[in-house]
Structures are given as structure tokens and as C-alpha cells.
Amino acid sequence: VLGLWLFVALATRECALRLAQFGAPGSGWAELGALAVPALVLIALARPSALRRALFGPHDDACRLAGCGPLALYVFTRLWAGNATPGDAAPLPWLPLLNPLEIGLALAVSGLVAWARSLTPPQRAAVPRALPASLAGATALALVTGAVLRACHQLAGVPWGEHALWTSTLAQAALTVVWSLIGVALMLAGHRAARRVPWLAGAALLALVVAKLFLVQLADHGGLARIVSFLVVGVLMLVVGYFAPLPPRRAQAGEAVAAP
């Protein structure tokens, strides 16, 4: 396990230094270098292989948790930190989802998912059931939010900073539309699968959107972008109210099916 950590640390350092030469400090290249090696190691060790048998031997399950767990924690924390950066891709042109930072974030997500799926049932049972789903949902929303804000910064010239993004009519309108679409998608999926948890998660996200509309965008005099935001949210709420009402509880659904 110590040898694995040493290898990952040295390889990550070397990869980060090499890729950082392509851009300025803190660019997307540096983040890609910091995430690529540990994420790829998590992916490589997620499935039974000769490499994993050579590293962990007869203690595969325990060593996979003790050896790869800290790597997964590093990747998770680095993913959140990298998501808060503008992700400059110079000297290459910046492309949504195809820039160094977001490629690194995609590798990180793939590595975390692969590692989580490789855990044994007893190891999964030791973790509260709501915790992985909550972390996954919060991380997914944060990644989508970061991608939208980076697109506004890179493509529309909105300055990268808390105040500038908070007061930008374009950034706030884009977040409103994207969050609303995600909320509606969750509610539709929950209704179709007769599962209340995703439906309630989508409803909570739509409630957050409405609060943001009134607390942030209502005070803004941005004109067209603000009007479009209100119209989109209103139409989506009408759609979801008609096509995806709150699904019944499982017990109630079972009684309804059993009734003649």
C-alpha cells in the first residue's frame, strides 16, 4: 500500500509539472495533471486483474479499501477544488466539456464511480445509505454549476470572481435555466419510476431556483435575460405539474395495483 501511494504521489507530481508547462499557474492543465494519475489508478484497480493481485495479494478487499480509499478522498477533494477554477486552456482554444480542466474532472468522476462500485457489500453496508447519494447529488450539481459559470466566463467574458458572477445577468440566467431543466428531469424520472426521493430532490432544486429568481434576479434590471429566466421557469413548472405529480408512497402504490 505504501508503495502504491509513493508511486501515485511521484507520478502525479511529474504529470502535473509536465502539463503545467502548457499554461499559466492554476490553469486547467495543472488541474488535469493533478487528477489524471490517481483517477486512472482508481479505474485500473477497480476490476480484478493481475496488477491488483500483485499489489494486494490475498488481502485484496481490505487493501483495496485502505490503499485506494485515501486516493479516492484526494481525488474527491481535488475535484471540488478544481471545479472552483476558471479552467484556462491556453494555448488551445477553450471548448465546453473538451478543455483540460473538465477532462480531468470527468476522469476524477470516472475513478470515484469505479472505486465505489468495486467495494464489497459489507464495506458498502458500513456507510449510511443516504451519504453516497447525497455526496453524488451535491457533486453533480456543483460540477454542472461550475461548467455553466466557466462557459459564461470563457465564452462571454464574464470576469471570474464571486461578485462578478453573482451580479452577472447572463450567468444568473444561465444557472436558472440549467437548474430548472435538471429539477424537471429529476421530477419526471421520479414520477416515471414511482420514486419519491428523486422527485423531491427535483422539487427542492426548483424551489431553490424560485428563491434565486426573487432574491437575486428580481432586483436585477438586466432586461431580456431576466424575462427569459422567469418565462422558462414558469413554463417548466406548468409542464412538471401536469405531467409529473408527486408519486405515491410504495405501500400506497402496491395497494392501488392490487385493488380490482
Please describe what each predicted stretch is.
Residues 1-260:
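Alpha-helical transmembrane segments of multi-pass membrane proteins
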